Amino acid sequence: MTIIIGMTYVILLFILLLSPGISIPITTVWALNITGTQGPDILYGTPADDNIRDHGAEDMIFGLEGKDQISGDRGNDAIHGDVGNDTIRGDGGYDSIFGNDGNDTLSGGFDNDTLTGGSGIDNFNCGRGSNDTVTDYNQVENETKLGNCENF
């Protein structure tokens, strides 16, 4: 199993001196393009807007904060968006997709997937020819179902 942690990103640390004895640290975080391996992976994003893509096997992906673009590719994946307005695609495999906080777009892709939006106004796109399940669809939150979603 491969663990790829995007939190090993580069941080620029500046110290702004206001007056003697008072300082404020300022940090800058850059988004990452994170690509998994053919084997099972655990992939972590950063607090920035990341692009995370896996290439197969059964993986766990955590976008963390930011407006992330996440693709599970092949394999039965567990994908978590976390805080931010994420776009998450399961693609192939029987995936469990969690948007968590934010206004997310969740797409199951092929096979039978489980889509859970979390808080926020979420869009669900169930895969063509699949039997996806949406576990928290709520019209009161003005959520939108797209595509072939049938199971709520």
Protein language model features and the residues they cover:
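Bacterial N-terminal signal peptides
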Residues: 9-22
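Extended, small-residue-rich solenoid/repeat segments and analogous flexible loops
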Residues: 20-46, 51-53
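Long alpha-helical scaffolds
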Residues: 31, 56, 65, 135-136, ...
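Glycine-centered beta-turn/loop sites at beta-strand termini
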Residues: 36, 45, 54-55, 63, ...
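Leucine-rich solenoid repeat scaffolds
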Residues: 116-152
